[in-house]
Curated annotation (Swiss-Prot):
Gene Ontology BP annotations: acetate metabolic process
List of residues binding CoA: 221-225, 319, 342, 367
Reaction(s) this enzyme catalyzes, per UniProt: cyclohexane-1-carboxylate + succinyl-CoA = cyclohexane-1-carbonyl-CoA + succinate; cyclohexane-1-carboxylate + butanoyl-CoA = cyclohexane-1-carbonyl-CoA + butanoate
Provenance organism: Geobacter metallireducens (strain ATCC 53774 / DSM 7210 / GS-15)
Keywords assigned by UniProt, alphabetized: Transferase
Subunit structure of this chain's protein: Homodimer.
Record-level Gene Ontology MF annotations: acetate CoA-transferase activity
Name used for this protein in its record: Succinyl-CoA:cyclohexane-1-carboxylate CoA transferase
Tree of life domain: Bacteria
Length: 437
């Protein structure tokens, strides 16, 4: 008993010795260093702001990150001092990537930990963590993804301890002995406002819910369509969740009993995710919740792990679909808008799954109905996020197009049938010119 108490006192002493200010932590970074920060809500904002404040003292610092929050170093004058490799562009990094002040790194999300191991040095890693427990462990809280791998490889580790960060279960723990510097803060976590569901999103959610069977295992993203799907699935039974992103709509499914994870072949009884983003309600629900497990992205998003569960249903959004079924979900022509993320991982995982179904969703039009999202060919320079051989279903507010197992001719017909009526004529003419129909 005494040795346990001594260990606890030792952890507390070590913790106190490592506490520092954000400015002191930022002083650890040297010119030429490579840094790695977690996706979105896991970004240690106080550390990042302090680092950005001294950027003109540094040269050739590189930051690798998936999705960014702090805008301070995404400027033309910052690039020689701190250059960002964006693995997924956000509203913060998009302009910098397009103007060459930052770089974009194409990737499959499940491969990021391996890329860290094999290609990218990590001199300093920083992350938000939940408070330390009596055994000396923090958790990565809402952003596990590649965080554990970055910490494992880093020469120096900075954690930002926030009591508002939920303590999560799964493979997401960091011991005090792995940490070099501790920043304490108590600030609200980055959150999202849930927009009202539009009629278009409600229609798409309704079509998908009709094809989701009891006992299915779900992956959904964030936004109006996933929220609409979650609402439409509240009457289902024995659903499971194995997802990249955990969102508010999934909380409703769990609280209603529609999700109990009882029919999953892996992690039976548990909801599995690699990061979470939503409202404070989601974060409160996740805190110390034994029904939710957070695991690294190379496990969660690995297609063959996804496919170990039967009846996987993946639901992902796209920006543009051509008449063969190629989906561009990340760029407008050559202008990078976001990234592949986990879309390709889960589309492939659902294809591997026994009884699995993959849904690619989009409104039929953009820009107030002036542009069709279903097009004869993708725009010049567009990235193919999900290839034609992987796409199963495409869904708009006008219906569902089955593509998997269909001829090129039938694919074109099915896609034209779910395009906006205003564009079906010109799509049909284009398809004939290309000998698609």
């Amino acid at each position: 008993m005494e040795s346990v108490k001594n260990a606890k006192r030792s952890y507390e002493k070590e913790y106190r010795q490592k506490v520092c200010s954000p400015v002191e932590a930022a002083a650890v970074v040297k010119s030429g260093d490579c840094l790695c920060f977690p996706i979105s809500v896991g970004e240690p904002t106080l550390f990042v702001r302090a680092l950005a404040a001294r950027r003109h003292e540094l040269e050739g610092v590189v930051i690798n990150q998936q999705h960014h929050l702090c805008p301070d170093y995404f400027t033309e004058d910052s690039a020689p001092h701190i250059k960002v490799n964006a693995w997924f562009t956000s509203h913060v990094s998009r302009e910098a990537v397009q103007k060459g002040w930052a770089d974009f790194v194409p990737n499959y999300f499940h491969e990021v930990p391996r890329l860290l191991r094999d290609y990218w040095p990590v001199d300093v890693a920083g992350t938000v963590v939940s408070p330390m427990d009596e055994h000396g462990y923090f958790t990565c809280s809402l952003s596990v993804a590649y965080t554990m791998e970055a910490i494992k490889k880093a020469k120096k580790v900075v954690v930002q301890v926030n009591p508002q960060a939920p303590r999560t279960h799964g493979n997401c723990h960091i011991h005090i002995s792995e940490v070099d510097h501790i920043i304490e803060c108590d600030e609200p976590l980055a959150s999202l406002t849930i927009p009202p569901i539009t009629p278009v999103e409600e229609a798409i959610g309704g079509y998908i819910s009709e094809l989701v069977e009891d006992g299915s295992c779900l992956q959904l993203g964030w936004g109006g369509i996933p929220n609409s799907v979650c609402k439409a699935l509240l009457h289902k039974k024995d659903l499971g969740i194995h997802t990249e992103l955990l969102s508010d709509g999934m909380v409703d499914l769990m609280l209603s009993g529609a999700v109990n994870n009882s029919r999953k072949q892996t992690h039976t009884g548990k909801t599995v995710a690699t990061f979470a983003l939503g409202t404070s309600r989601l974060y409160e629900f996740m805190n110390e919740n034994p029904r939710i497990e957070m695991h690294p992205v190379d496990y969660v998003n690995y297609p063959h792990n996804i496919g170990k569960n039967d009846n996987v249903v993946s639901i992902n959004a796209t920006l543009e679909v051509d008449l063969l079924g190629q989906c561009c979900s990340e760029s407008f022509g050559h202008l990078q808008y976001s990234g592949t993320g986990g879309q390709a991982d889960f589309v492939r995982g659902s294809n591997i799954s026994n009884g699995g179904k993959g849904f690619i969703t989009t409104a039929s039009t953009a820009k107030n109905g002036t542009i069709s999202r279903i097009v004869p060919t993708l725009a010049p320079g567009a990235s193919v996020t999900t290839g034609k051989n992987d796409v199963d279903y495409v869904v708009t507010e006008f219906g569902v197009a089955k593509l998997r197992g269909q001829t090129a001719r039938q694919r074109a017909i099915n896609l034209i049938n779910i395009a906006h009526p205003d564009f079906r004529g010109e799509l049909t003419e284009a398809a004939r010119r290309m000998n698609r129909i």
